[in-house]
Amino acid sequence: MNNRAGCLVTNLSGEMAYQSFRPNPLPPEPPIEMSNELIAKLIDANRRLATLDGLSSRIPNMDLFVSMYVRKEALLSSQIEGTQCTLDDILNPFAEENTNLNVSDVVNYIRAEEYAINRLQTLPLCNRLIKETHAVLMEGVRGQEKNPGEFRYSQNWIGGQGSTLRNARYIPPNPEDMVDAMSDLEKYMNGEDSLDPLIQAALIHYQFETTHPFLDGNGRVGRLLITLFLMEKKILSAPSLYISYFLKMNRVEYYDRMTQVRKTGDYEQWVLFFLQALSDSAEDAIQTIDRLTEIHNRNVQKFNSMTKRQQTNAINFLIYLEK
């Protein structure tokens, strides 16, 4: 395998020999082909994200809305990795004290996302921030023994339970190539590129997942990078998008599309899929905001028809619900 996306590299020798994938730096060469289909999807995704960002700034109780969306994204992203947990578990006011490892995984994702968003105010989207976020994600949960906050020093692989280097579905870059790949990715995230930021986000997510720099937690960090990059590029002013629902519902295609890039160098089919994920996710969020605004307006009308005492009781009740 030697194509636009990278090549296979033989490691060790004899019976111990195996091949890992060495990704080429971004952006792809030759450049992404801007077909009519891709341009149409790009315009649609940008339009919906702009609508979402405009609406999200006007929604009643923005902090509560974002808090719920962060929890929903954390849950769905963790479920993609096989975490067995429900939204009720996460909304439980005692979730942080829950000893259930599945709940702890999701609670840590919430902490990691909040940490990373705050850290973006003082750091660019860089490997230091990625490592710090990973450390928060893995603190005190399954995988905490796998060097949280540090890039791996050993070879990892992707496959079913009990798989080995010999029968793995995919073997990411060896440790030396991984360090080079993450250095290249850091430069790309902070460099100048004529590509639209949404296409850049697609490439960055693919490249991170392909590089798999950690021993555990790569998928969750990779999906979190999407939100962080869109916020850094001012596409989103708040984490009001949960793309993991689309990726979970299309999980097989999600993985197959990235595999196709590695095998054939066809970035375009991956970018098309990613743009569709952004469009559908943004539209879902827009509809949610519309419904919440409608409910809010109905409640305001009811509130205005109440007596002073009823209004006071209603306000206290709503404050209680929002805690």
Regions found by a protein language model. Give the residues of each.
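FIC/Doc superfamily catalytic core
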Residues: 1-323
